[in-house]
């Protein structure tokens, strides 16, 4: 069962119902990239996997409009709570998804969901999305997220180096470019699916 359709949907705060039109979606080794636009402006999102349990979502927009985050279609058995700077979505099995923001974000619980308001954002806006299999794992890892959100450069560099290492081992100079494309796709798929 899915925990949610999306744990973090971003929009411009002044019109949360406005439809965004996708401009570009790409998956690069180690990064998901998506850009979309509305009449209020464009939003770009980059998702990098910084550890086995956490992905860093970086958001930029072409305007200084306030941003609003919320979850979308939480599963029927999911209980959503807000604790300090984190949204915690718990499943009865013990699995949890957390969405952690920086302290300047105005976080509020609504019904079985949340809103996170970012006023006059300084870009990029960093959000950590994590998946944990137990309360113990969650407690141990949540304390590391403030440093990731405030200084993501080391984690992003480690992510780039990790992927470079994976790809360096499979790319061969004696093979045609088609081989390299297939090899990169295979490694990307295998690593992306390892936790499912």
List each language-model region with its residue ranges.
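Acidic/polar, glycine-enriched structural segments that form the non-catalytic walls/loops
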Residues: 42-44, 49-196
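An extended acidic
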Residues: 1-38, 160-172, 176
């Amino acid at each position: 069962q899915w925990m949610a359709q999306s744990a973090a949907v971003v929009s411009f705060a002044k019109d949360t119902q406005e439809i965004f039109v996708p401009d570009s979606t790409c998956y690069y080794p180690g990064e998901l990239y998506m850009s979309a636009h509305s009449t209020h402006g464009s939003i770009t999102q980059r998702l990098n996997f910084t550890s086995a349990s956490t992905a860093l979502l970086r958001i930029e927009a072409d305007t200084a409009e306030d941003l609003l985050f919320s979850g979308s279609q939480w599963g029927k058995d999911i209980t959503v709570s807000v604790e300090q700077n984190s949204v915690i979505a718990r499943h009865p099995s013990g699995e949890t998804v957390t969405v952690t923001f920086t302290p300047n974000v105005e976080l509020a619980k609504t019904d079985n969901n949340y809103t996170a308001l970012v006023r006059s954002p300084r870009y990029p806006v960093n959000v950590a999305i994590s998946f944990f299999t137990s309360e113990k794992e969650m407690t141990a890892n949540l304390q590391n997220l403030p440093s990731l959100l405030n200084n993501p450069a080391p984690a992003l560099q480690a992510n780039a180096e990790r992927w470079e290492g994976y790809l360096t081992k499979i790319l061969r100079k004696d093979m045609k470019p088609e081989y390299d494309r297939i090899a990169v796709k295979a490694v990307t798929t295998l690593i992306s699916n390892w936790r499912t």
